[in-house]
Amino acid sequence: MADDRVAILTEDEEELKRKHLERFDRLSLEIQSPSQPPENDVPNDTAPTPSPQHELSCCERLFLRVNRHLLVSKVFYLFFYAAYGSLHPLLALYYKQLGMNPTQSGLLVGIRYFIEFCSAPFWGIVADRYRKGKAVLLFSMLCWILFNAGIGIVKPPIMACKEETIPTTTKVPTVHPTPSNETFFPNTSSTSQMRRRRDLIGQYPWRTILSSGQSSGYISEHRIKRDSNLSFTPAPEELANTTQTNQTSTTTQPKPSTSISTSTPSSTNTTSSSTTKSTTTNPNLPPPEYNMDQVNAIFLLILLVIIIGEFFSAPAITIVDTVTLHYLGPHRDRYGLQRMWGSLGWGLAMLCIGIWIDHTSTNLIIGNMECIMKNYKNYHIAFIVFGVLMVIALIVATQFKFDVQHHDTNEGQEVGNQQENVQPRGSPGTRSTDTPTIVQAEEFHFWDLMRLLCGVQYSTVLFVAWFMGFGYGFVFTFLYWHLQDLTGTTTLFGICSVLSHVSELAAYFTSHKFIELVGHIRVLYIGLACNTARYLYISYLENAWTVLPMEVLQGITHASVWAACISYLSAAVPPPLRTSAQGILQGLHLGLGRGCGAMVGGIFVNYFGVAETFRGIGMASLVILLIFSLIMYITGQNEKKEDKMLAENIPIPSSPVPIATIDLVQNTADVAAPARPEPKLPARKTQHQQEQEDLNKPAWVPSGSPWVSVALLVYQIREMVLLAKARPTVEVQPLQGTDEVRSDSQEDQSPPVFSDAVQNENTPSGLQDHSGSPTAQLDVPTRDTQPPSQHIS
């Protein structure tokens, strides 16, 4: 009985503590009542279940540990990225087989990133404003299926084989000066393919004889122009009679024979031999000739389909990322565990499709000449598999729960709590007894962020991020193009995809330790050096299969560099502007960088070739590495200390860095105070801003779609403009350089309040105030004067 009472008291204390922390807008450290567990809270994938473990089998315990909401996200990522990986890496090769040049192929691949960069924020705002997230998601998935299938049903252009022959010569019969009724016998003893110079002296009697013989097929005093592309050989009946080394007739003086190449068969009324035309084909089949008018028409048609389809299909992955982050709640650092299933599906689908296409390659017969185009790839298999997998992803997408009511309820509770904290102060005859007035410590604006990023140190980091995105887009578009020129197969492409995605996953989950070990800037050095080695190695390839060792560097050149850039900028800017900084970085790296890599790289490939372009980008990477290291050496004199400081600011998901926050709360008293105007309340922070200011959350997560932060950036700017128009100017009190807090009025006789806030020595130089953390908040003392009480959270 005593134990039950203790348990009840413990539950009541926990409930009171939770309400007390929510009132002051502090992050609740998962203090929940055991009797009333929340229904919509999703703690993690590995939360223990209350069922008895000894009565369940291993498989049952495994299924019980998996959250159902996050299981939907995992399955969606698996099938969506499996569909994407089965088709889109091969689209450049499909365009090449349709007869397009590298410029056209690069434009069709790269324009997707620019359209997605513009349309994803638009659809995100529409879905949030009208609360139609699920409808927009399903419509976007349907557009993925229809418009990508439309690319596959485009009728290919007409192809014609180019005829090539081995040059041969035709031996004209040796003519002797005989009467017109005598038979001409050809000299068929010579089988040499060499042509001999005509004897001008011996040519004159020939012309006389041919002109005097009216039965001859040659026109007198005229020579027929020789065709350089056609060749003639003696007739088969003439070849059958070549049993003697030299066949002659009863003539007086034989003249030397000549080699004349004609385009018409020779025939006479006498018994003469006629030559027939025979062609000799090259065993190496030439590439087919495309009808360029049809190729250009197909290019414009596919370009129109991509522009329309990508505009409507762009918000799909953005909305799913948002829902998944909502499922995770405060455990956003586990986003990588959900997104990794997409990388797994991409690699496996690409490998299977590559093997399947290799085993179903056909020899295309063109025209009546039966010109065979070897190793003609049937890419319709990829389109069919893409459609099937995307339909499955569409079915899975119907299971997402857009809990708008619960989200609105939480926002309403937050507003209600803030109104409860404010209402007693404005009511007549009432006095605030336990609620302090919180004044925002410091307010940062978007232009402050732009002024920071335009500095030499951070602008060079942004340029490196753009260049790495440029290289990633070029490799995604033209690596398989180059390997196919080296007789690489689609099976090789699948193996390359598996290796690159495995290396990216390993790099994502070890990036924190890697950055902490060497520092942010040195990670960028290593990424540029690996880019140089990789591109130069690819440019000198002679065997396509030797590219496999360099595909392991994809994790360093993409994943590690991406994580280092996000972490570096996140630690440099204050938390209220962290989302804006990440949106700018993602737009430069994944939007503008990848798009320029595909489009500009296609122009370079069209003019210089694939290998030469790889070599040029590799040398450019080396030059940028040298310039970047020189700039960092000049601007960052204490680089080692700064990198160590930034690495320490990255909280580890398993053991976040504890940060002590001391709140100075003024209690009530019966001492009367003179009346004074009430201070203006600060602007209400949105839920997203509160999540961004939470220092217990990691500075970066492996992002699956870059447009989530871009949409939030646009929405945040719009919200700032509306708030600035709606509310009057709020007087903001800056942080004090000393520990003394000034009173709000000269008439206030309350003693000064001293703060013992803990300052973080590892805060990087940026927009943050010199007195401490940018999220530090001061509680202004009220009119009631009593000793302040300290609350540590």
From Swiss-Prot:
Pfam family, any one: MFS_1_like
Name assigned to this protein: Major facilitator superfamily domain-containing protein 6-A
Family statement drawn from the similarity comment of this UniProt entry: Belongs to the major facilitator superfamily. MFSD6 family.
Gene3D superfamilies hit by this protein: MFS general substrate transporter like domains (1.20.1250.20)
Compositionally biased residues, Polar residues: 180-193, 415-434, 757-776, 783-793
Residue spans of biased composition, Low complexity class: 170-179, 241-283
Keyword Transmembrane assigned: yes
Record key words, sorted: Membrane, Transmembrane, Transmembrane helix
Localization (cell): Membrane
An individual GO BP term: antigen processing and presentation of exogenous peptide antigen via MHC class I
Region (Disordered), start-end ranges: 28-53, 170-195, 239-288, 412-434, 674-699, 734-793
Transmembrane segments: 75-95, 107-127, 134-154, 297-317, 340-360, 380-400, 461-481, 489-509, 555-575, 590-610, 616-636
GO CC field: plasma membrane
Tree of life domain: Eukaryota
InterPro entries noted in UniProt: MFS_assoc_dom, MFS_MFSD6, MFS_trans_sf
Membrane topology type: Multi-pass membrane protein
Species of provenance: Danio rerio (Zebrafish)
